[in-house]
Amino acid sequence: MNGTRLAVAATIVLWLTTPSHAQDAGSRAAGVAPQPPKSLKVAAVQFRSCRDLDKNVAGITSQIRRLAKEGVRVAVFPECALTGYFEDVVKTTTAEQLADAERRVANACREVGIYAVVGTPYRDGGKLYNSAAVIDPSGRVIERYHKIQLAESWPTPGDHLSVLRVDGVPCSVIICHDERYPELVRLPVLAGARVIFYLSHESGIRQESKLGPYRAQIQARAVENTVYVVHANAPANDDLSGSHGQSRVIAPDGNIFGEVSMFGEEVVTADLDLRRATAVNALNSLAQGPLTDWWKEGVKRVRIVEVGSPAPVESRR
């Protein structure tokens, strides 16, 4: 193993052995060395958004509360779940309306003590982003990822990749068209990520030529990096419009071990055995070949989200 691989491996070990807030505090109080989690229970929520922001919030928060009772630690919702993937609605929803809706979702996470990854437009300084808000069990937005590779004309492209902790597990986020770009997963994995949350509102089932590539691409991202992918997609509508569902959880060997239908508002849950997410295929690209230095420079551009650094989300209606 060369020096570059050692450096990245050290980063990954740090992320896998650094626990979440409660684990860390409890371990210090007991005088016991913290242990990394061995599993993570996740849910990919195939949520059907409508044009009514309040109804979407009600549906999302209802799922969060229900899934918490089932022991789920992180609930993942589709791209633009908060508003629906409707360009006119996205463009006319104000920053204040989005912030209020997000606060209500954050309240639900805080009340039941789980994480949520929610697709939402986000306005900042006159710019409009296609984003994912990662909310922790205290109701804090610990990361806000903006879609980088765009299929739409309305958003501003994002400018960063990130690695964040969910119950101490290093994770990253991509959105829909991002899946076509292998580096958007490979770089966060080299920076420590073991689970990728993938939010989408993919092409409708009438666009048959795209369905096979959609499946192949995201499975490739899992196996070529030896990590889990938790994919929340919007369902197809009865008139065959909208997306095409099939939300799924993909194992580090690329096989799908949980998937739902094309049309239903359904949820796929899974207990991820984190020992399987070794990132070995990603790390091999640092061990040999002409791109070692290139990957090393790319890893430096990944934002590492430190526990406790984000500002809290206001938790009142």
What does each of the following model-derived ranges do?
Residues 7-19:
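Bacterial N-terminal signal peptides
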Residues 20-24:
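Boundary at the C-terminal end of the N-terminal hydrophobic targeting segment
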Residues 35-50:
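Short beta-strand segments enriched in small/hydrophobic residues
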Residues 53, 58-138, 202-227:
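Cys-nucleophile CN-hydrolase/nitrilase-fold catalytic domain and related Cys-dependent amidase chemistry
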Residues 83, 90, 133, 144-151, ...:
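Short beta->alpha transition motifs characteristic of CBS
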Residues 97-117, 170, 180-268:
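CN hydrolase (nitrilase-like) catalytic-core segments centered on the catalytic cysteine
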Residues 107, 123-220, 243, 282-288:
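Active-site catalytic loop in hydrolytic enzyme cores
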Residues 163, 233-317:
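C-terminal beta-strand edge segments of enzyme domains
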